[in-house]
């Protein structure tokens, strides 16, 4: 094999965005080592520039015909491009939200950004991994970096406790997932690439394959915080640095769903009915427990933790539907969830920087002292609850419509009921912020310091908040382009083998389903 043939089979240009992130990571690390504390303003700019360049390259790779790299070990199709874009965007916004937070804590910003970029790199590779070894290495890169970020505030006992819990439970989850993958490898006769595994699995014993599926789903469910594999989520979210919680709730979760789609659809075609059943149970448990337990929370971060568990239940509806409309609505919801969830955490960060607390009761009367945070948090929470015309309403509408067309009537009705429950605890926070009587104002708000936007890191934090809030508001009204993007990413991914139950035609307001399926070709 000559060099040109090898280069053609490797097709390394597919992972050019990941290469840019690696170069950015090394540049940030070296800059921080050379300049030390003087690199405070330079390292975030370098990181965001590199992430922006990687996103630009991803857009140029859209609809390319040669999307397999490294002898089929990585798939750079349109679906992976969207998921990798979500990971990159969540990392970029997280950096904007982190600068002031990390600076005020007295820890190194350069090291923080380096670990965050490493986690992003793991999430990107996981979103396109098409081979078992690549999947596991990518998953561990993301996981280990997440453990380090969770315990990054070394002087905070809560951060140390959260990191230890996350590490212990995460290590057990990785071991379970690895055991399932090793069974899959053995049953496939030593094949590691997912398409080749699917071809060989017809000869496997059903019971052994089912055991493998159960272990693999357990590992994936941990990554997406699905009940009953959610125990780490509330404690880790409460004790971790708030910007890291924001990244874990969006970037890490998106990578987990990308893994779920690619691994389960490609490697377990014979057990589609079985894994749909398991995910239906996970979705029901996540919707009920996430929304019901959130009603009793007094900490804003714990409330958002249980909210993220419930949001995973909503996203699973699209996965269970298994149609083009289902996968498209799933991708669309993750796109808008990026902005509305990060926007909510940006408001929590701003409030905690000024008051040192995240207790919901301390938000009482906030609109009188900080209208920006009140407006931003209100819009993001209303969007998470699915109030029109915000982005979250259309995201849930598309998911429920796809689920209904796929015959998931009970699951969709349950999701509607739990969505109404979620509106209650979101509005409870908003009501707390807009109390009018001075005597109802909390002690933290009474002593609320005047905002000084000239402090280092405050302008990026405000920029991140404004971008997320505007995107949350506008993405609902202009939902067509985003949904078309999600639909194109799904229809262009051949491994899904879609036979849609109904074609979805979008308008600026609501999706319309054709009553008859498309004619067979």
Curated annotation (Swiss-Prot):
One of its GO terms (cellular component) is plasma membrane-derived thylakoid membrane. Its main location: membrane. It catalyses: a plastoquinone + NADH + (n+1) H(+)(in) = a plastoquinol + NAD(+) + n H(+)(out); a plastoquinone + NADPH + (n+1) H(+)(in) = a plastoquinol + NADP(+) + n H(+)(out). It comes from the Bacteria. GO terms for biological process: ATP synthesis coupled electron transport; photosynthesis, light reaction. Keywords: Membrane, NAD, NADP, Plastoquinone, Quinone, Thylakoid, Translocase, Transmembrane, Transmembrane helix, Transport. Belongs to the complex I subunit 2 family. NDH-1 can be composed of about 15 different subunits; different subcomplexes with different compositions have been identified which probably have different functions. This is NAD(P)H-quinone oxidoreductase subunit 2. It comes from Synechococcus elongatus (strain ATCC 33912 / PCC 7942 / FACHB-805) (Anacystis nidulans R2). The lineage of its organism: Bacteria, Bacillati, Cyanobacteriota, Cyanophyceae, Synechococcales. The gene is ndhB.
């Amino acid at each position: 094999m000559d060099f040109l043939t090898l280069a053609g089979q490797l097709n390394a240009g597919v992972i050019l965005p990941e290469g840019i992130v690696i170069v950015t990571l090394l540049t940030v690390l070296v800059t921080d080592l050379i300049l030390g504390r003087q690199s405070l303003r330079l390292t975030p700019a370098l990181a965001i520039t590199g992430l922006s360049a990687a996103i630009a390259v991803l857009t140029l790779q859209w609809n390319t015909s040669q999307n397999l790299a490294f002898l089929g070990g990585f798939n750079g199709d349109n679906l992976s491009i969207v998921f990798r874009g979500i990971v990159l965007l969540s990392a970029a916004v997280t950096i904007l939200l982190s600068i002031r937070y990390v600076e005020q804590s007295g820890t190194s910003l350069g090291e923080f950004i380096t670990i965050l970029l490493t986690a992003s790199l793991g999430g990107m590779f996981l979103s396109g991994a098409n081979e078992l070894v690549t999947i596991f290495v990518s998953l561990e890169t993301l996981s280990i970096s997440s453990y380090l970020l969770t315990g990054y505030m070394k002087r905070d006992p809560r951060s140390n406790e959260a990191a230890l819990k996350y590490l212990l439970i995460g290590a057990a989850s990785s071991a379970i997932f690895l055991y399932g993958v090793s069974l899959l490898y053995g049953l496939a006769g030593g094949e590691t690439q997912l398409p080749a595994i699917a071809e060989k699995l017809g000869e496997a014993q059903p019971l052994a394959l089912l055991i493998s599926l159960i272990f693999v789903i357990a590992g994936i469910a941990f990554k997406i915080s699905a009940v009953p594999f959610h125990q780490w989520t509330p404690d880790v979210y409460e004790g971790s640095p708030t910007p890291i919680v924001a990244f874990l709730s969006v970037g890490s979760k998106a990578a987990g769903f990308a893994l779920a789609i690619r691994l389960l659809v490609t490697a377990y075609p014979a057990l589609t009915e079985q894994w749909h059943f398991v995910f239906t149970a996970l979705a029901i448990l996540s919707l009920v427990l996430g929304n019901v337990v959130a009603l009793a929370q007094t900490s804003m971060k714990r409330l958002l933790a249980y909210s993220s568990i419930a949001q995973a239940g909503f996203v699973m509806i699209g996965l269970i539907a298994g149609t083009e409309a289902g996968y498209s609505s799933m991708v669309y919801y993750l796109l808008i969830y990026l902005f509305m969830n990060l926007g909510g955490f940006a408001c929590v960060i701003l409030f905690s920087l000024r008051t040192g607390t995240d207790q919901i009761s301390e938000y009482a009367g906030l609109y009188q002292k900080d209208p920006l945070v009140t407006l931003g948090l209100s819009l993001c929470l209303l969007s998470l609850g699915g109030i029109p015309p915000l982005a979250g309403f259309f995201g849930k509408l598309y998911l429920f419509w796809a689920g209904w067309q796929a015959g998931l009537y009970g699951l969709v009705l349950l999701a509607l009921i739990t969505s109404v429950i979620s509106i209650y605890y979101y509005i409870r926070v908003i009501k707390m912020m807009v109390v009018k009587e001075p005597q109802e104002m909390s002690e933290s708000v009474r002593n609320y310091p005047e905002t000084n936007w000239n402090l280092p890191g405050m302008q990026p934090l405000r920029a991140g908040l404004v971008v997320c809030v505007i995107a949350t508001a506008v993405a609902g009204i202009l939902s067509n382009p985003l949904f078309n993007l999600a639909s194109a990413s799904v229809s262009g991914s051949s491994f899904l083998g879609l036979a849609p139950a109904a074609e979805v035609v979008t308008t600026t307001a609501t999706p319309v389903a054709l009553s008859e399926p498309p004619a067979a070709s």
